[in-house]
C-alpha cells in the first residue's frame, strides 16, 4: 500500500504516505492496492479512447464511465474491494469493445501505452493485490526522485478531483465531448509514467483550466434543473417527527428523495456539503426539507449515531459506520461503498423511507437556530455593484474567501479564529464544508449586506471566480488587484483541483492550510511559492496583518 492523497496521510521523517495494513482514512491495504489497479485499467481505457477519437469514434458509455469509476478512488468514497474490482473489470471490457471498434476501421490500430493491454490475472483478491504492486504510484521513486513523483501525484489527484465534478455534472445531464477528450488525453499520458518536470507542471495547469470548464457545466446543470440559489434561512435544530438524513453533493438524489417522501410524514435533513441545497428554489419548495443536521464530515461517527433515522451517502465523505453502530441504517448511492452496508443501485428510495417510518424520529422540536445560505452565482453577481459602492465609500475594506475542506486536525481551529478575527468592515465569502468551523456564529452585516456570505459547495468556487472576474472588469483592474484574499483549507482531491483551477487562472498569493499536501516536496512548494505566491498559513495575527496590508 502507498497512498498520500489526503491531508490525514501519515507523515514521518522517513517520508509521507500510508503504507501499512490500513490507511488513516480506514481504507485497507487491499482496497488501496486494488484502487491502484483500477486506475491503471482506467488509464488503458483512456488510451484507447484517445485512439478511437482519431477514427471519429466517440463512445459515451466509455466517456461517462471513466471519470465515474475514477471518482470511486477519491478519499472517503468507496472502501468496498469487490466493487473496485468490478469497476476494473468493466473498464477492461469497455476498452476491449472500443479496441474492436478501432480495429474494425483500421486493422493496424495500436496504442503505445503500458496500460493499454492490461488484464486482471485472477478472480482472487490476494492475487490481484499482488498484481497491483506493479502499479503502485511510488514504484519508481528511487529512479525519478521525490519531485517528479510529487508532480505526477499532483496531476493524478487533481485529475481525480476533476473527474468527480465531471460525474456530478453528468448526473444532471451535463457533459462536453471536448472535456472528455481532454480528460482521456491527460489520463492516458499519466499512464506512461511521465518524468519531465516542465511537462508535468504544464499538465497540472491544463487540469486546472479543464476543471474550470467542468465547474461551468456543473453550475449550468444545477441551476438549470433547480433554479438559481437565493438567500434562504435554514434551521440547524431538530424538528419533531420521523426523519432521513442525506449527505454528499448529489442534488438529484436529494430531489428524488424529496419527491418520494412527500406526503409520507418523513422529514428530510441535509448534512455536510448538501447544506447549500436549501438555497435552490426547486428543492426548498418541499416543506418537509426541514433543516440541516450536524457539522463537518469528520464528526459523523458521533452525529450519525445520534440521528434517529436512516442516512443516505450520495458521494464523499463516508467513514467507518461500525464505530457508531449505525451501519444497519446507513445507505450508499452511486460510487459510494462500505463493506456490509446496503447499497442503492437506482433512484428508488422506498427501502430507506420504510426504515425511517419504522424508527422513532425526533421526539420533539428544538428551539430553531437559523443560518443563511444560498448566495449562488446570480445572487453574487447581482450584488457586485453594491460591493463596489461599499468599497468606494470605504464601508467595505476587504473580502476574504475563507473556505475549503474540513477535517479532524486540531490546527483547523485556525479557520474559526481567522473568521472571528476578521474586522467588522470586511466580508467573509465561504464555500465547501470548511464553513462548518464558523457558519453558526453571528457576524452581523454591513449596511444590510451579511458579513458572512455562503456561496455553496466546493464546486461553487466557480461562482466566487465569476464574481471576482466581474468585480475586476467593473473596476478596470486585475483579479489580483482586488481587495480580496483567499484563505483555503484542503483535505482531499477536489480541493487540489480547485487550487489548480485558481492557479491556472492566474490567481496569486493564496494562503492554504492547515498543512501542505504530503506529496508536495519542499522544492515543489518553493516553485509554487515563487510562481504563484502560494504559501501556508502561519498565525491568524500574522496572516491577517499581511493580507490586509497587501
From Swiss-Prot:
This protein's GO CC annotations: cytoplasm
GO BP annotations, alphabetical order: response to hydrogen peroxide
Location relative to the cell: Cytoplasm
Keyword Lipid metabolism: no
Alphabetically ordered keywords of this record: 2Fe-2S, Cytoplasm, Iron, Iron-sulfur, Metal-binding, Oxidoreductase
Cofactor binding notes: Binds 1 [2Fe-2S] cluster. Binds 1 hybrid [4Fe-2O-2S] cluster.
Residues annotated to bind hybrid [4Fe-2O-2S] cluster: 249, 273, 317, 405, 433, 458, 492, 494
Top-level taxon in the UniProt lineage: Bacteria
Cofactor requirement: [2Fe-2S] cluster; hybrid [4Fe-2O-2S] cluster
Binding site for [2Fe-2S] cluster: 3, 6, 18, 25
Catalyzed reaction equations: A + NH4(+) + H2O = hydroxylamine + AH2 + H(+)
Keyword Hydrolase listed: no
Enzyme Commission code(s) on record: 1.7.99.1
InterPro entries in the cross-refs: HCP/CODH (IPR004137), Hydroxylam_reduct (IPR010048), Prismane-like_a/b-sand (IPR016099), Prismane-like_sf (IPR011254), Prismane_a-bundle (IPR016100)
A Pfam cross-reference name: Prismane
A single MF term (Gene Ontology): metal ion binding
Main location as per UniProt: cytoplasm
CDD domains: HCP
Record-linked NCBIfam families: hybrid_clust, PRK05290.1
Function: Catalyzes the reduction of hydroxylamine to form NH(3) and H(2)O.
Family as reported in the entry's similarity comment: Belongs to the HCP family.
Protein's recorded name: Hydroxylamine reductase
Amino acid at each position: 500500500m502507498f497512498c498520500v492523497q489526503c491531508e490525514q496521510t501519515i507523515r514521518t521523517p522517513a517520508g509521507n504516505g500510508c503504507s501499512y495494513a490500513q490507511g488513516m482514512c480506514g481504507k485497507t491495504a487491499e482496497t488501496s492496492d486494488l484502487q491502484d489497479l483500477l486506475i491503471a485499467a482506467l488509464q488503458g481505457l483512456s488510451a484507447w479512447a484517445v485512439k478511437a477519437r482519431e477514427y471519429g469514434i466517440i463512445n459515451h458509455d466509455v466517456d461517462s464511465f471513466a471519470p465515474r469509476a475514477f471518482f470511486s478512488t477519491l478519499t472517503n468514497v468507496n472502501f468496498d474491494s469487490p466493487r473496485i474490482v468490478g469497476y476494473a473489470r468493466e473498464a477492461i471490457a469497455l476498452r476491449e469493445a472500443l479496441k474492436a471498434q478501432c480495429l474494425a476501421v483500421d486493422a493496424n490500430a495500436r496504442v503505445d501505452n503500458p496500460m493499454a493491454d492490461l488484464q486482471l490475472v485472477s478472480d482472487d483478491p490476494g492475487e490481484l493485490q499482488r498484481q497491483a504492486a506493479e502499479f503502485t504510484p511510488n514504484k519508481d521513486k528511487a529512479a525519478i526522485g521525490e519531485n517528479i513523483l510529487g508532480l505526477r501525484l499532483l496531476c493524478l489527484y487533481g485529475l481525480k478531483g476533476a473527474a468527480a465534478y465531471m460525474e456530478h455534472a453528468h448526473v444532471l445531464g451535463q457533459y462536453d465531448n471536448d472535456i472528455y477528450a481532454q480528460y482521456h488525453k491527460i489520463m492516458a499520458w499519466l499512464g506512461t509514467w511521465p518524468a519531465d518536470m516542465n511537462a508535468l507542471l504544464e499538465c497540472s495547469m491544463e487540469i486546472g483550466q479543464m476543471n474550470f470548464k467542468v465547474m461551468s457545466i456543473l453550475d449550468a446543470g444545477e441551476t438549470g434543473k433547480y433554479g438559481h440559489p437565493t438567500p434562504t434561512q435554514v434551521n440547524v435544530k431538530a424538528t419533531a417527527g420521523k426523519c432521513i438524513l442525506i449527505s454528499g453533493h448529489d442534488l438529484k438524489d436529494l430531489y428524488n428523495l424529496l419527491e418520494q417522501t412527500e406526503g409520507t410524514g418523513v422529514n428530510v435533513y441535509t448534512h455536510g456539503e448538501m447544506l447549500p441545497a436549501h438555497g435552490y428554489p426547486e428543492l426548498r419548495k418541499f416543506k418537509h426539507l426541514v433543516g440541516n443536521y450536524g457539522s463537518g464530515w469528520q464528526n459523523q461517527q458521533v452525529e450519525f449515531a445520534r440521528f434517529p433515522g436512516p442516512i443516505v451517502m450520495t458521494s464523499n465523505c463516508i467513514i467507518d459506520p461500525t464505530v457508531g453502530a449505525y451501519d444497519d441504517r446507513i445507505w450508499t448511492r452511486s460510487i459510494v461503498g462500505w463493506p456490509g452496508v446496503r447499497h442503492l443501485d437506482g433512484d428508488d428510495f422506498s427501502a430507506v423511507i420504510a426504515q425511517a417510518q419504522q424508527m422513532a424520529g425526533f421526539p420533539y422540536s428544538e428551539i430553531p437556530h437559523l443560518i443563511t445560505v444560498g448566495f449562488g452565482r446570480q445572487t453574487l453577481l447581482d450584488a457586485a455593484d453594491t460591493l463596489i459602492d461599499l468599497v468606494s465609500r470605504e464601508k467595505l475594506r476587504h473580502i476574504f474567501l475563507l473556505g475549503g475542506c474540513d477535517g479532524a486536525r486540531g490546527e483547523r481551529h485556525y479557520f474559526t479564529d481567522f473568521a472571528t478575527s476578521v474586522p467588522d468592515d470586511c466580508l467573509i465569502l465561504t464555500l465547501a464544508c470548511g464553513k462548518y468551523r464558523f457558519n453558526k456564529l453571528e457576524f452581523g452585516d454591513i449596511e444590510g449586506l451579511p458579513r458572512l456570505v455562503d456561496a455553496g459547495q466546493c464546486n461553487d468556487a466557480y461562482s466566487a471566480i465569476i464574481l471576482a472576474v466581474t468585480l475586476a472588469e467593473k473596476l478596470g483592474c486585475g483579479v489580483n488587484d482586488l481587495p480580496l484574499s483567499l484563505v483555503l483549507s484542503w483535505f482531499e482531491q477536489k480541493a487540489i483541483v480547485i487550487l489548480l483551477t485558481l492557479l491556472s487562472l492566474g490567481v496569486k498569493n493564496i494562503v492554504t492550510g492547515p498543512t501542505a499536501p504530503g506529496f508536495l516536496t519542499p522544492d515543489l512548494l518553493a516553485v509554487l511559492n515563487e510562481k504563484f505566491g502560494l504559501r501556508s498559513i502561519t498565525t491568524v495575527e500574522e496572516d491577517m496583518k499581511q493580507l490586509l496590508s497587501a
